[in-house]
UniProtKB/Swiss-Prot annotation:
It comes from the Bacteria. GO terms for molecular function: methenyltetrahydrofolate cyclohydrolase activity; methylenetetrahydrofolate dehydrogenase (NADP+) activity. Homodimer. This is Bifunctional protein FolD. Belongs to the tetrahydrofolate dehydrogenase/cyclohydrolase family. Pathway: One-carbon metabolism; tetrahydrofolate interconversion. Gene3D superfamilies: Leucine Dehydrogenase, chain A, domain 1, NAD(P)-binding Rossmann-like Domain. Its EC number is 1.5.1.5, 3.5.4.9. It comes from Halorhodospira halophila (strain DSM 244 / SL1) (Ectothiorhodospira halophila (strain DSM 244 / SL1)). The gene is folD. The lineage of its organism: Bacteria, Pseudomonadati, Pseudomonadota, Gammaproteobacteria, Chromatiales. It catalyses: (6R)-5,10-methylene-5,6,7,8-tetrahydrofolate + NADP(+) = (6R)-5,10-methenyltetrahydrofolate + NADPH; (6R)-5,10-methenyltetrahydrofolate + H2O = (6R)-10-formyltetrahydrofolate + H(+). Pfam families: THF_DHG_CYH, THF_DHG_CYH_C. NADP(+) binds at G166, Q167, S168, S191, I232. GO terms for biological process: L-histidine biosynthetic process; methionine biosynthetic process; purine nucleotide biosynthetic process; tetrahydrofolate interconversion. PANTHER family: C-1-TETRAHYDROFOLATE SYNTHASE, CYTOPLASMIC, C-1-TETRAHYDROFOLATE SYNTHASE, CYTOPLASMIC-RELATED.
Length: 290
């Protein structure tokens, strides 16, 4: 029986609508609307598309969106100064610097310059550490979005055998922590892992994030497994495809995400949720200081 499709586009639309309702309620109570600053360095075509989608989603949800499009040759110091000003800006609750950055700018330095309470990407070491320690904090958008998708399947995650393919700081590592926190038994596969196919076959849940189109073949997927394809790759033909052979895998999986229309929309929806959470957290900090 073909897998059920985890429609991230539809679920994300509902999540964005809920954020919009919450923003409207804030304004009715006399609170300011949440504010997000998005910084784009250079004009990487893919990054520019992602940034446009994020800004549009903010506007639709009633979130204040400020755009900072910087030249590709901007110095690291100038970028850090911009972040410092946004850290101090009372109208801004979230700061997002679109990655990747040009080679002359150190990404980790930039990430660590963002105030952790405004780090809506969830990449700051403080927020990563809080995730590892199972403490409240701003969580990386894509893994948090994946957990929302999994919740919509109604499947009990506790005790499941999960395989995460990829160990990036953006997806693989925080995804592993999210699944550990859900009490899964997690195996991480990377470029030095042996017998990857066999490890995947044994999994109840597979999360693929390696950036290699079709790497995970259909016969790697165990019968009834849940497959989350985070990969998004553009082929020479212009077609977008994931890391999983969708057609073959969908004949074995119980649930599977499409590419596009699976995880991508959830990442954007989660960014809005994080921005709303950041605004609420700052409200609490302000009230506590009074």
């Amino acid at each position: 029986m073909p897998a059920q499709i985890l429609d991230g586009k539809a679920i994300a639309a509902k999540r964005r609508a809920l954020v919009g309702e919450a923003v409207g309620q804030r304004i009715e109570r006399g609170l300011r609307r949440p504010g997000l600053a998005v910084i784009l360095v250079g004009q990487n075509p893919a990054s520019a598309v992602y940034v446009r989608n994020k800004r549009r989603a903010c506007e639709e949800a009633g979130i204040l969106s400020r755009a900072y499009d910087l030249d590709a040759d901007v110095s690291e110091g100038e970028l850090l100064e911009r972040i410092d000003r946004l850290n101090a800006d009372p109208e801004i609750d979230g700061i997002l610097v679109q990655l990747p950055l040009p080679g002359h700018i150190d990404e980790q330095t930039v990430i660590e310059r963002i105030d952790p309470v405004k780090d809506v990407d969830g990449f700051h070491p403080e927020n990563m550490g809080r995730l590892a320690l199972r403490l409240p904090g701003l969580r990386p958008c894509t893994p948090r979005g994946v957990m929302t998708l999994l919740h919509h399947t109604g499947i009990e995650l506790e005790g499941r055998d999960a395989v995460v393919l990829g160990q990036s700081n953006i997806v693989g590592r925080p995804m592993t922590l999210e699944l550990l926190n859900a009490r899964c038994t997690v195996t991480v596969c990377h470029s030095r892992t042996r017998n990857v196919a066999e490890r995947v076959r044994q999994a109840d849940l597979v999360v693929a994030s390696v950036g290699k189109p079709g790497l995970i073949q259909g016969d790697w997927i165990g019968e009834g497994a849940v497959v989350i394809d985070v990969g998004i790759n553009r082929l020479d033909s212009g077609k977008l495809t994931g890391d999983v052979d969708f057609e073959a895998a969908s004949q074995r999986a119980s649930w599977i995400t499409p590419v596009p229309g699976g995880v991508g929309p959830m990442t954007v929806a989660t960014l809005l949720e994080n921005t709303l959470d950041a605004a609420r957290n700052r409200d609490e900090l302000t009230a506590a200081a009074c």
